[in-house]
C-alpha cells in the first residue's frame, strides 16, 4: 500500500535514514523540512519532489527560495517555526514523521495531531516537555502515536497482543551505556566532545550522541515511556545492554518476558512506524544469531551519570519538571559542543535546575515554553 509522508527534520540523521525507508518502500513524500541545511534539502527536493518544503532558519530560507526560483514544479516554501507547524498541519499525508531535534518539535507534533494525522514520533522532547498536552491531544483526535525511538518501538512491538498488554507489570528499557560505560567521575573529568561523540553502536546526530554519553538520552526515554505506556517510573527498569541487540523488553504478571531484538539500525523502528500495522521486507540485514557470542546486561550508574538521576527526579516531581530538565540539557549540551563547559558540567547543571523548583501541577503550552526559557537562563547564570 502506497503512503504519503510528511517528514519534519529531513536533513538530520533520523531524517536521512527515514528517506532510505521511504525510497525502498516507494512511498510519496508530501512535505520536507530542515532547519538550515540548504544544499541537502535541495538534493532531497530533486529526488523526492515534495509539494511543500519548510526551512525554519530565515537566512537559510532566503537562500532556498533563491535556489528554487524559476524551477518547474518547485515545491511551495514555508518558513520559520510557524511554517514548520503549518507544514505539520497540512491535509495530504497519511503519516507525519517528526524527527526535529529538541523542544522545537513540540508545536509541530501538536499541530499534526490536532489536524488528524497519525504521528510517527522521533522527537522525544515532544513527550518529555509536553507529555500531558500530547497524550490529551492524541486521545481527543483519535490518531495513532507511533514511537520511532528504537527502545520505544521495541516496547510497542512487544505490546501488540492487546490482551496480554493488560497484564504488563514492568518495562525493561535498554541502554548501550554510551562511550564512557564503566568510567567513574574522575575519569570523566577531562573528556572532550571528540571523546563523547564516539558512540560504540549507533549512527546518530551530535546532540543525541552527547545525550547518550551522559545517559541523559536514557533519562529522556524513561520519561517518554511513562507517557507512551502508562507505567509509573518505578516500574521502568533501565538495563545496560552493551551490544545494542536487545532493544527493550516487557514483563507480564506471570513474570514472563518478551523482548525485541535486531541489528542496531534505526531504519528498523522507522520502517515499523511508517508501515504499521504491516510488516514488510526492508533495507536492514537480518540478525545472525550464530554470530552472537555474548549478550551482557548491567545496571546503569546513576551516581556517576547525574543526568539520569535528574530525569528520575524530574518525572517524579511531575508537571514541568521534565521540561526544565530537557531545557537545561539542551542549553548545556550546546555549551559543551562550543567548548564552553566540561563534560561533567552537563549533569551538574541539569540536576541543579531540577532541584531549583517543585514544578508540579497542570500546565499550558505557553507554560512549557516559559519553563524552557527559565531552565536555559538558569544554566547560563550558573556556569
Please provide the spans of the model-predicted regions.
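Catalytic, metal-anchored helix/loop core of enzyme active sites in primary metabolism
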Residues: 1-383
Amino acid at each position: 500500500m502506497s503512503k504519503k509522508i510528511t517528514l519534519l527534520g529531513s536533513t538530520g540523521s533520523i531524517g536521512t535514514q527515514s528517506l532510505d525507508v521511504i525510497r525502498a518502500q516507494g512511498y510519496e513524500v508530501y512535505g520536507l523540512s530542515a532547519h538550515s541545511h540548504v544544499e541537502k534539502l535541495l538534493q532531497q527536493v530533486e529526488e523526492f519532489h515534495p509539494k511543500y518544503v519548510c526551512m525554519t532558519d530565515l537566512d537559510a530560507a532566503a537562500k532556498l527560495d533563491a535556489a528554487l526560483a524559476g524551477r518547474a514544479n518547485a515545491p511551495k516554501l514555508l518558513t520559520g517555526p510557524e511554517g514548520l507547524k503549518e507544514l505539520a498541519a497540512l491535509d495530504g499525508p497519511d503519516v507525519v514523521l517528526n524527527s526535529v531535534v529538541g523542544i522545537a518539535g513540540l508545536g509541530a507534533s501538536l499541530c499534526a495531531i490536532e489536524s488528524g494525522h497519525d504521528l510517527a514520533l522521533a522527537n522525544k522532547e515532544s513527550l518529555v516537555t509536553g507529555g500531558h498536552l500530547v497524550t490529551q491531544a492524541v486521545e481527543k483526535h483519535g490518531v495513532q502515536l507511533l514511537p520511532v525511538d528504537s527502545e520505544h518501538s521495541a516496547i510497542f512491538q512487544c505490546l501488540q497482543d492487546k490482551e496480554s498488554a493488560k497484564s504488563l507489570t514492568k518495562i525493561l528499557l535498554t541502554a548501550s551505556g554510551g562511550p564512557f560505560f564503566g568510567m567513574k567521575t574522575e575519569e570523566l573529568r577531562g573528556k572532550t566532545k571528540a571523546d563523547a561523540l564516539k558512540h560504540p553502536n549507533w549512527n546518530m546526530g551530535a546532540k543525541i550522541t552527547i545525550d547518550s554519553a551522559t545517559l541523559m538520552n536514557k533519562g529522556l526515554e524513561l520519561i517518554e515511556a511513562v507517557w507512551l505506556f502508562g507505567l509509573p517510573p518505578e516500574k521502568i527498569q533501565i538495563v545496560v545492554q552493551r551490544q545494542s541487540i536487545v532493544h527493550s523488553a516487557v514483563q507480564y504478571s506471570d513474570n514472563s518476558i518478551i523482548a525485541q531484538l535486531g541489528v542496531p539500525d534505526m531504519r528498523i523502528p522507522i520502517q515499523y512506524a511508517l508501515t504499521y500495522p504491516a510488516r514488510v521486507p526492508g533495507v536492514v540485514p537480518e540478525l545472525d544469531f550464530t554470530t552472537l557470542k555474548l549478550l551482557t546486561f548491567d545496571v546503569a550508574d546513576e551516581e556517576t551519570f547525574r543526568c539520569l538521576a535528574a530525569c528520575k527526579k524530574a518525572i517524579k516531581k511531575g508537571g514541568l519538571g521534565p521540561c526544565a530538565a530537557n531545557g537545561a540539557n539542551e542549553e548545556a549540551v550546546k555549551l559543551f559542543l562550543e567548548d564552553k563547559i566540561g563534560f561533567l558540567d552537563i549533569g551538574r547543571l541539569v540536576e541543579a535546575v531540577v532541584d531549583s523548583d517543585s514544578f508540579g501541577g497542570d500546565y499550558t503550552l505557553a507554560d512549557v515554553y516559559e519553563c524552557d526559557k527559565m531552565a536555559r537562563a538558569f544554566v547560563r547564570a550558573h556556569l
